[in-house]
């Protein structure tokens, strides 16, 4: 038990150092990838981080004096930021209403649009090419264990990115995501949808930021279950095509700023 107690103290001290110091987040751009493949990959990373934490949790619950190395503990949970574009797909959150899907299966298949019920929060949304989909896999125990604050930070990343393009993004009370003119009745338009899942404070899923997205796909759903409000894109707001690489760089820079992290890249 003495070994277990020392490991728990070490785990708490290192977590404190992580909070005080700038943490590193491994960035991976997955390119164009099927939704299910990206979902499975997120689950793989999440479960690996949970496995690394599970030894410490078992010690805290008095499971014995198991000896572990710091290479197999919570001390080495790895943060990730994944960027991806998906072929056309509708995804429905676990609290979503299937009635917000306005297209039948036959027509959806004919148009080549996939459909998945997911384990994230939120309702129905669309993912497609020329949309920056970001999946942060973060251990919130090394940040703040507050889902609300985490969602607000994701929103802030996109709000700052819009500001880089001279666009005022904002929040809409009670509606997670990023909007333009949320207070102007009849002109409210959503530019970024957000839906996440956490397990043992490890996050997955994330945000979908419309850059040059084909907005016609949103005509066949009630986006996020919110009727009578529009969806927009960076292209539509600026009146021109936007360079995707440029937009990604801006999102990455603002992610580092808001979360106080440093993105690192694999060679």
What are these regions (language model features)?
Residues 139-141, 197, 210-212, 237:
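Solvent-exposed residues in well-ordered beta-strands and their adjoining turns
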Residues 196, 201-202:
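Acidic/histidine-enriched ion/cofactor-binding microenvironments in catalytic or ligand-binding pockets
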Residues 179, 215-267:
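C-terminal accessory segment of soluble enzyme catalytic cores
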Residues 202-210:
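Conserved phosphate/anionic-ligand binding catalytic regions in large, soluble enzymes, centered on
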Residues 16-186, 242:
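N-terminal lobe of the biotin/lipoate ligase/transferase fold
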Residues 191-194:
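Histidine/acidic-rich helix-loop-helix segments that form or flank divalent-metal centers
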Residues 7-19:
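Short, Lys/Arg-enriched N-terminal segments with co-localized hydrophobic residues
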């Amino acid at each position: 038990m003495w070994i277990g107690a020392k490991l728990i103290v070490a785990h708490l001290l290192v977590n404190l150092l992580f909070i005080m110091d700038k943490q590193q987040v491994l960035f991976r751009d997955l390119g164009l990838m099927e939704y299910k493949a990206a979902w499975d990959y997120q689950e793989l990373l999440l479960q690996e981080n949970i496995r690394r934490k599970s030894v410490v949790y078992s010690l805290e619950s008095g499971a014995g004096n198991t000896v572990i190395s710091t290479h197999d503990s919570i001390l080495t949970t790895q943060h990730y930021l994944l960027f991806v574009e998906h072929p056309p797909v509708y995804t429905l959150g676990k609290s979503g209403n299937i009635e917000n899907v306005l297209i039948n299966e036959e027509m959806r298949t004919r148009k080549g649009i996939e459909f998945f019920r997911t384990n994230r929060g939120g309702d129905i949304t669309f993912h497609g090419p020329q949309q920056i989909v970001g999946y942060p896999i973060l251990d919130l125990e090394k940040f703040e264990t507050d889902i609300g604050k985490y969602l607000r930070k994701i929103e802030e990343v996109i709000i700052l990115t819009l500001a880089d393009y001279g666009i005022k993004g904002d929040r809409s009370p009670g509606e997670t995501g990023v909007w333009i003119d949320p207070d102007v009745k009849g002109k409210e338009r959503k530019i970024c949808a957000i839906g996440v899942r956490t397990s043992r404070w490890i996050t997955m899923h994330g945000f979908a930021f419309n850059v040059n997205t084909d907005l016609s796909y949103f005509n066949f759903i009630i986006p996020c279950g919110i009727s009578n409000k529009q969806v927009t894109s960076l292209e539509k707001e600026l009146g021109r095509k936007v360079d995707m690489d440029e937009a990604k760089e801006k999102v990455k820079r603002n992610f580092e700023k808001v979360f106080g992290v440093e993105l690192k890249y694999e060679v």
